[in-house]
Amino acid sequence: MDGGGAHRTPEDVFRDFRARRAGMIKALTTDVEKFYQQCDPEKENLCLYGLPNETWEVNLPAEEVPPELPEPALGINFARDGMDEKDWLSLVAVHSDTWLLAVAFYFGARFGFDKESRKRLFSMINNLPTIYEVVTGTAKKQSKEKTPKTSGKSNKSGTKPSRQPEPNSRGPKMPPPKDEDDSGGEEEEEEEDHENTLCGACGDNYGQDEFWICCDACETWFHGKCVKITPAKAEHIKHYKCPNCSSSSKRARA
């Protein structure tokens, strides 16, 4: 986002925030193997940047002083080999959340947001789970605590695979839509339950018309598009592991 002469709204800044956030979540989840390799402790001070096009990059800090935008935490690569991987990723996630807020409110100040505009911006930001919550699985736990799972319902799905496997089956899973034969109150509860399901890659909520798949290792739900799994591919997967669990297993065997 550039300064420009056009009037900017909290919604404009929030779109920038959300795009940068999506990129950083990808780095710490679906692209974690690539991110881990790029954070070589032998290199100079490296930073994780979230970009406005929903991608990420690991790079050196800006050379200009002061920088055009607030800078993310320096030297995230130095702690990589001295910490447990999950703890290191959690630390990077915390610093990433801090940086995103700094950038958002930098734009807010630059565009002259008043009290109400700042409040609206923060409210939109606060409605999303933090990167830390997504990376550590806290967002998923909070969602479960907020809306208890309903039981005794048929689990039909509008996308393939045609049904959600039973707990002991090995196939990939998807959040089931509401049962049309249930009462209206139960339908609303089920719908709210689904809406509170968060993608482990992008952190967005479940949508009824979207294909989702569940990792059999960490039991985290993902948009199929976020982990590059289509309904056709899912039909042939007996035991699905998300990119994060797959890469962790590879490093454990190395």
From Swiss-Prot:
Any single biological process term in GO: regulation of DNA-templated transcription
Keyword Zinc: yes
One annotated GO molecular function: histone binding
Record site: Histone H3K4me3 binding: Y206, W212, D216, W221
This protein's GO CC annotations: nucleus
Domain of life from the UniProt record: Eukaryota
Subcellular locations according to the entry: Nucleus
Biased composition (Low complexity): 149-162
Compositionally biased residues, Acidic residues: 179-194
PROSITE patterns: ZF_PHD_1, ZF_PHD_2
Family listed: Belongs to the Alfin family.
Function: Histone-binding component that specifically recognizes H3 tails trimethylated on 'Lys-4' (H3K4me3), which mark transcription start sites of virtually all active genes.
Domain notes: The PHD-type zinc finger mediates the binding to H3K4me3.
Assembly mode: Interacts with H3K4me3 and to a lesser extent with H3K4me2.
Protein name (Swiss-Prot/TrEMBL): PHD finger protein ALFIN-LIKE 8
